[in-house]
């Protein structure tokens, strides 16, 4: 499987690892990367499998949360990246935080924006929930059935987003970015460009549906790594995110990390990286 990634800035610079979410790709970081490289950082920004310029599996059954974790971890190991500052967004958090849990010695600090690592918590009942909830979730989506584009943009964003993406014949990647990110028509076409037709969009189609698929593994990442984390960890969410709905449970999960600090970015919506290009180190200092 071929993974496309950007490698910008001085090769001896401090490493910034930027990981996109759904349905974006590394093009999301086009405004942030020049700011970072101008300050001497080396920026690595991959496209996950099924997105951007990376290889794309045509069957939704070939995609899993663990597959994405494995591919991103393999990339970091092959590039032998160390002392990394990771900035993860949306699904980049669910994947990236699991990668960090598998290779914690390679990371020095983390910024998580409009994302979380969803887990049930400790205790017997919560352990039971981690096994049952994925099935309840799938049953709920099946019972509710497909959502139209109009339903998706009309409200109840998270549930309707999953129903739309899971059942859409041809998910409108550029349209999603334009709706949630207020991008121009030219930028809309740029986001859509890596996908000549619906066959190439299986990764984007199934990604939201996979969100609760590995709650148990997420929980073990907290217990084994993140509850013992002693390095800087910043939660940098926006105050106007229609996708997550600024769900306090998402922040509560990350607050299990002892060093976690939280700031709120005023104004931008879900794709906050389209509007701001701060230095991760500056964010950490704040």
Where are these regions (language model features)?
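Flexible "cap/lid" subdomain of the alpha/beta-hydrolase fold that forms the substrate-access gate
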Residues: 2-3, 8, 15, 28, ...
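Glycine-/small-residue-rich active-site loops that bind phosphorylated ligands and cofactors
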Residues: 24, 241-242, 271
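Alpha-helical and His/Cys-centered functional microenvironments
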Residues: 24, 93, 274
């Amino acid at each position: 499987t071929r993974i496309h990634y950007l490698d910008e800035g001085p090769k001896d610079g401090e490493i910034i690892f930027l990981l996109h979410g759904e349905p974006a790709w590394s093009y999301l970081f086009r405004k942030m990367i020049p700011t970072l490289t101008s300050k001497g950082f080396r920026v690595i920004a991959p496209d996950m499998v099924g997105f951007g310029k990376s290889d794309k599996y045509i069957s939704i059954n070939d995609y899993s949360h663990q597959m994405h974790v494995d591919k991103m971890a393999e990339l970091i190991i092959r590039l032998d990246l160390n002392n990394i500052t990771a900035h993860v967004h949306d699904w980049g958090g669910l994947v990236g935080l699991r990668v960090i849990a598998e290779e914690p010695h390679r990371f020095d600090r983390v910024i998580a924006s409009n994302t979380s690592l969803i887990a049930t918590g400790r205790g017997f009942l919560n352990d039971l929930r981690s096994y049952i909830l994925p099935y309840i979730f799938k049953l709920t989506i099946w019972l509710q059935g497909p959502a139209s584009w109009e339903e998706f943009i009309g409200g109840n964003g998270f549930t309707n987003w999953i129903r739309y993406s899971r059942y859409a014949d041809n998910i409108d990647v550029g349209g999603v970015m334009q709706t949630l990110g207020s991008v121009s028509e030219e930028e809309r076409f740029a986001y859509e460009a890596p996908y000549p037709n619906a066959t190439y969009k299986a990764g984007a189609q199934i990604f939201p549906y996979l969100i609760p698929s590995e709650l148990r593994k997420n929980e073990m990442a907290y217990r084994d790594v993140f509850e013992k984390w002693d390095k800087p960890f910043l939660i940098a969410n926006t105050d106007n995110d229609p996708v997550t709905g600024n769900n306090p449970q998402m922040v509560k999960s990350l607050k299990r990390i002892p060093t976690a600090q939280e700031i709120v970015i005023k104004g931008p919506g879900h794709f906050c990286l389209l509007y701001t290009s701060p230095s991760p180190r500056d964010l950490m200092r704040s």
